[in-house]
Amino acid sequence: MVGDTLKLLSPLMTRYFFLLFYSTDSSDLNENQHPLDFDEMAFGKVKSGISFLIQTGVGILGNSFLLCFYNLILFTGHKLRPTDLILSQLALANSMVLFFKGIPQTMAAFGLKYLLNDTGCKFVFYYHRVGTRVSLSTICLLNGFQAIKLNPSICRWMEIKIRSPRFIDFCCLLCWAPHVLMNASVLLLVNGPLNSKNSSAKNNYGYCSYKASKRFSSLHAVLYFSPDFMSLGFMVWASGSMVFFLYRHKQQVQHNHSNRLSCRPSQEARATHTIMVLVSSFFVFYSVHSFLTIWTTVVANPGQWIVTNSVLVASCFPARSPFVLIMSDTHISQFCFACRTRKTLFPNLVVMP
């Protein structure tokens, strides 16, 4: 008797749970909408929320580990490699993307709407855009740095400059300055979450929305993505030059049969392989995200699934890149081994030139 009663009440309790968390406004459930359709829609939001939660949580943990690792190297007095500052900046930018986009989107997917007012939404979107663009610029800097280091004939005077810590600091500063200024237009576009007063807003992210005219949206899309496409073009050129140089050097080594010549390029080849994995994954994820973003900007009424997938794809690289670096960096493996065996921090650390 009790079991039959629970079977009858279970669908009602499930529907009540979804109504409790997802019916914060009248737009979630129309009068003519069937309750089963609403249950499917709410279940889809739960799946999106779980995806955002796992991706954001894992990504923040990975990037936080990298930031702590590079800060430990700095504070313990060990010499930093030229790429350590670039990689730490990449981890910081990725953390900004996940923190200012992944966390609010996760909470909105689970039904926690109206978390931010207009001012909060503006700054959340602003810092997310800055983090995304700094991540792009940092990948370009890392790619160009490795290309010049691998093949100094590309730019002789730059090969000397990249060994200077001050020059690396200056390049990292240049990754921030233009994007802090150029993304100020986001403060004019973003509003608070949709409600009965601003239901005409164009794109709804659950916790924030933005509204702009079609002419302004098209102009903003062109100005916004033009530097990005130029950066992607630079990535393709630098990556192509590295692949060509490694292929030519491999042919030379095979022709000379010299172990002496193959020693150093093997280390450079491993570093180049790691950077190529980062660049290729960034290129794929960012290209898909750019296409979806342009679609939501130009199209009059983009579907909510496009907006959701755009945010999910945008967080793929920041969540996955730290683990590529963790698995490929020998310093990190030495650090983990030292912690496991409870030895002194970095007892046998070999500093790369």
From Swiss-Prot:
Extracellular side stretches: 1-56, 106-132, 191-226, 296-303
PROSITE patterns: G_PROTEIN_RECEP_F1_2
A GO CC term attached to the entry: plasma membrane
The organism's place on the tree of life at top rank: Eukaryota
GO biological process, one term: sensory perception of chemical stimulus
Family of this protein: Belongs to the G-protein coupled receptor 1 family.
Annotated SUPFAM superfamilies: Family A G protein-coupled receptor-like
Segments on the Cytoplasmic side according to the record's topology features: 78-84, 154-169, 248-274, 325-353
Leftover remarks: The chimpanzee and orangutan orthologous proteins do not exist, their genes are pseudogenes.
Record note on what altering residue 269 to D does: In allele VN1R1*3
InterPro entries linked to this entry: GPCR_Rhodpsn_7TM, Vmron_rcpt_1
Membrane topology qualifier: Multi-pass membrane protein
Positions glycosylated per UniProt: 117, 198
Disulfide bonds: none
Record field: transmembrane: 57-77, 85-105, 133-153, 170-190, 227-247, 275-295, 304-324
Single annotated GO MF: pheromone receptor activity
Tissue and organ distribution: Expressed in the olfactory mucosa, very low expression in brain, lung and kidney.
Organism: Homo sapiens
Annotated function: Putative pheromone receptor.
Chief place where the protein resides: membrane
Gene: VN1R1
Cellular localization per UniProt: Cell membrane
Keywords: Cell membrane, G-protein coupled receptor, Glycoprotein, Membrane, Pheromone response, Receptor, Transducer, Transmembrane, Transmembrane helix
Gene3D superfamilies, per the entry: Rhodopsin 7-helix transmembrane proteins (1.20.1070.10)
UniProt protein name: Vomeronasal type-1 receptor 1
One family name in Pfam for this protein: V1R
